A protein has these predicted regions:
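Flexible "cap/lid" subdomain of the alpha/beta-hydrolase fold that forms the substrate-access gate
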Residues: 1-13, 20-22, 32, 40, ...
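A short, Lys/Arg-enriched amphipathic alpha-helix followed by its capping loop at the start of a domain
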Residues: 48-57, 93
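Well-ordered beta-strand positions
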Residues: 16, 25-26
Length: 255
């Protein structure tokens, strides 16, 4: 395993969620800040800004079920609601009742669900009060969300279950890498080393076999769109959007 990635894992710990091990990191001092990572990687996404954030906040960064260093069960109903439950359970486990949120990609949808619960006081675990939310690129509005064709085929059709059997093949990696690179700007494309690290994260605990199942969160975006957007329109929680305009899924066309 890459040394920096291994160091990230060694600095973390696990808690039990529904009988599964969920990886998370906590560091820093100050107001609690919950980081909700994107799909299909994990909390290591935050590594470049981790030192800066931990200077000002007590930072909590879990890996969602099916991703990163957390459990990746095959027989599991992955959903945005379940991811939201896990984040609430973790904060409750840590004795944290309020937090700022920084969310990205699928994390935006999880943040929207947490916000909707916050507005009516109906949390699954604990009594989380949201101090603020900062949204990074993510499909918060399905009418402007344009997922890649491969993601739609793998996540919204039976092809996902069929192709999951060959997800660990070299061909699968070659097909995935252009999609990943497309998410980056022209001056920030991942190096070969970074792509190798991404592949290590996906391969950990045979994670590619559930990649398409986790990716079905895009269906939740359609199902719960009105409830989530209503919460955003009605809330008094301070919000900010930081949007990379070149993102083909949710770039300038969403902002």
């Amino acid at each position: 395993m890459d040394a920096e990635l291994a160091s990230w894992r060694e600095a973390g710990q696990y808690f039990d969620y529904l009988g599964f091990d969920i990886f998370y990191r906590v560091a820093g001092s100050g107001p609690p800040l919950l980081l909700i990572h994107g799909y299909p990687f994990n909390s290591f996404d935050w590594a470049p800004i981790w030192p800066t954030l931990t200077q000002r906040f007590t930072v909590i960064a879990p890996d969602m079920m099916g991703m990163g260093f957390s459990a990746k069960p095959v027989a599991y109903e992955y959903s945005v609601h379940d991811h939201a439950d896990m984040h609430e359970a973790l904060l409750d486990h840590l004795g944290i009742g309020n937090a700022h949120i920084l969310a990205h990609d699928i994390g935006d949808s999880v943040g929207q669900e947490l916000l909707a619960r916050h507005e009516v006081g109906q949390q699954a675990y604990g009594t989380l009060r949201i101090d603020s939310i900062t949204w990074l690129n993510g499909g918060m509005f399905v009418e402007t969300y344009t997922p890649r064709a491969a993601q739609k085929l793998m996540s919204r059709t039976p092809l996902g279950d069929i192709f999951s059997r060959v997800q660990n093949s070299p061909l699968s990696r070659r097909l995935l890498e252009p999609t990943v690179r497309e998410m980056f700007g022209p001056n920030t494309k991942p190096t070969r080393h970074m792509m190798d690290v991404f592949n290590e994260i996906l391969d950990y605990n045979d994670g590619r076999r559930v990649l398409h199942k986790v990716g079905r969160f895009i269906n939740d975006r359609y199902t719960h769109r009105n409830r989530w957007v209503r919460a955003m329109r009605q809330t008094a929680v301070p919000m900010r959007l930081i949007d990379g305009p070149i993102d083909p899924n949710s770039g300038a066309h969403m902002a």
